[in-house]
């Protein structure tokens, strides 16, 4: 069983690495980070779809069955995701592209998935955490691509930022709090699984503070720009009346 899991994770790692190499060849005029973020975007979309299917259709429901035995589909998705996180953590460390908080998030994610696979249980809530964590990931990558291509300061960029902040606050913080509560009050999950849940939620709050600061600064900047435009419009209108008279 352990050998089969290791082979699945190894195949996943090789798959993500192969996809990254393919993107690098297809985008030779772009940076390595461009190709890595394409891999991240692909994983985000794929993991959202798979984890949503597991949580909402295949089951079990994470809010009522935390700590339940892993299903075969949960195991496959966790192995697929574990291979990705190992790839991305290695890339981030090699290129030194991320700070300590993101590295801590990736490390906790890897440890949490390994823990669920080794125990053979708690895949239900780990899958739910995967869904909540990855739900905003495609938006984050879209924001980066918009900035790189010079289209960030546009209506599309504003929509992406709004959806990112709203989903992160509502799902990762709001729904995440409900999931953590269900995890803590349930007698089924192991104590160290609960501790891992607390650690992941604490990391989410660290991200949330940074996101709120960004949203506040952007809102103030947008407000001042709007005030400036209004002032210019009133001045032009006033000057026009003076010329007529």
Swiss-Prot record:
Q: Do you know which SMART domains this protein is assigned to?
A: TLC (SM00724)
Q: How does it sit in the membrane?
A: Multi-pass membrane protein
Q: Which domain of life is it from?
A: Eukaryota
The subcellular location is: Membrane
Instruction: Please report which protein family the annotation says this sequence is part of.
Output: Belongs to the TLCD5 family.
The name this protein carries in UniProt is: TLC domain-containing protein 5
Q: Does the keyword Nuclease apply?
A: no
Q: Give the source species.
A: Homo sapiens (Human)
Residues that span the membrane, as ranges: 1-21, 38-58, 75-95, 99-119, 162-182, 191-211
May I have one GO cellular component term?
membrane
**Main location per the UniProt record:** membrane
Enumerate the UniProt keywords alphabetically: Membrane, Transmembrane, Transmembrane helix
List, alphabetically, the PROSITE patterns matched.
TLC
- Domain called TLC: residue spans: 29-204
